[in-house]
């Protein structure tokens, strides 16, 4: 195999294993020929490791001696493997008595050959429910930039760098850490998640998770204090032996992802010693390399397990999905199991899929696929099943420190918190104490029961949000003092629509005395009272104006004011025509405000007959005619209403008795009909014009035939001015004055 030295050396090296032979070769000073690099699997190392897991350290040394190989495992490796090994299925008594030595190993291999590799599972990976941004295009296409920070450089402290990045985060903070015991860094993450609403994801190593929980005990924190933070545990790959014995490695990755734009990765751990005494280094990375860290975090999050007490909206006590049955029950003599010996099958790279992919299956380890040797209780077991299977719940372990627990996460620390010196001085940590804080608050790790309100991002959830804070209730709380007409919840937009008539009621009362004049039948108002009885589906005008519904808004007041204010007498229209016009006005509420004003002059001018004898109603056109102020301020009403000012018999539809009346019509005396604005100058002008008209016409006709002058016709030809002071509105009004527009309701 190795040529050159001599027969003795050749014989010794020919019988040695690959590692021993290479070491012996490198120890010879005169050996100048370099060996080619061989990347291959060592079968001797696999046999030795399997012997260590199955029969202990003595069997491991025996295999090393037989294979003429060096003891490649250190004492640290041996201790970790023997302390974290998990057992496989055992042979029956009959098979155990019949088989021994190689036959026993062969039987074990036949029984468990299908369990050497992970089994396919239908368990969905956890979702990044708090939100996860996409990698910006500028980051994905820009070149990689790296800045190195050494802990030895006191001017650029690594902890200060991390705290600064946490304070500047806007979209997401993702932390993958082995040990997390620094309280200041946890406070920075809590401030970012709670105060600024930045989603925070923590993936902590399973092996050292107990230290993070101890820190939370000292700070009296639980899952309720971290509503916008997800804490999960992760572990390394699982090594399986030929006989089914296996152990799980540690998660030693350490990096921080900020806003999917930059990454801080290195050897720094979130501990006080690393910030003050231990030396470490980190790399601050930007550019397209961030996409690789983004993908790696998604894969780690998909493999992670929830931490009891810090799982947020996910309850670890309730199973998310049923896991496969135990391996020993899945394989029977009559059930063939496929065997495979490909080295690549031991890799868990096949499960590395994005957790955002819905209903995607990935590979899980047989028997649950969890890191049970270190501790977090599997999410597939409920409280009753966990008690039956011999796994005491976290609450029982914390409430009973003397309770014997299996080797796991809470065995060394959380199960014996009462024995620690700091637990004697902290009422939140000493569970045996009867302090008011412990009795009232209980365990700070276990979450308190509260109703969970789930919101779907990107969807309008206002209409589904309960008024009284209970998810199952659809009734508004009577303590709020809010009146809701019905059992269904109202949106803010509907409430604004219902409140708009009542808010504009003050403007209508100041500027439009029409409804009350119509009710009382004031002879000086120029309005025909509705003397007939109301129909079954009709309300009084005042009730319509005060109704909070959308149908009785300002448009309803406008349509009814226009429909009755211009009628010269009660008998001018037949009952059928009156019903037809009321039906038309009711349809106008769905046509828009501009259509109401466009329809009014033409339709009213066509349906009001000319009266030659108006002596029967001498008091209908008295000097104190009320102005109809109908507050509309939209631009389309100004542009569309202007051309109708000079058409028909006039805006009010009053008869023109003789041509002599129009001869003396002056523009200075024409009264303007102001459309409802709450500005003080409009109200002042209204009262000034009202007082001036009463002063100039003290002897107006109170009875007899109306043929005494031009002032009556001047009062009848009123302009509908939409009092806007903007220059552009006036310009558009003058431009559209001569356009001929026709209403859609004109016959």
Swiss-Prot record:
Its main location: cytoplasm. It is found in: Cytoplasm. Residues 322-352, 374-412, 462-484, 517-550, 588-633, 646-672, 692-715 are annotated as: Disordered. The keyword Cytoplasm applies. Residues 697-707 have a biased composition (Gly residues). It comes from the Eukaryota. Coiled coil: none annotated. Residues 390-402 have a biased composition (Polar residues). GO terms for biological process: signal transduction. GO terms for molecular function: protein kinase binding. Phosphorylated in vitro by CSNK1A1. Residues 328-350 have a biased composition (Low complexity). Residues 1-309 are annotated as: DUF1669. Belongs to the FAM83 family. This is Protein FAM83C. It comes from Homo sapiens.
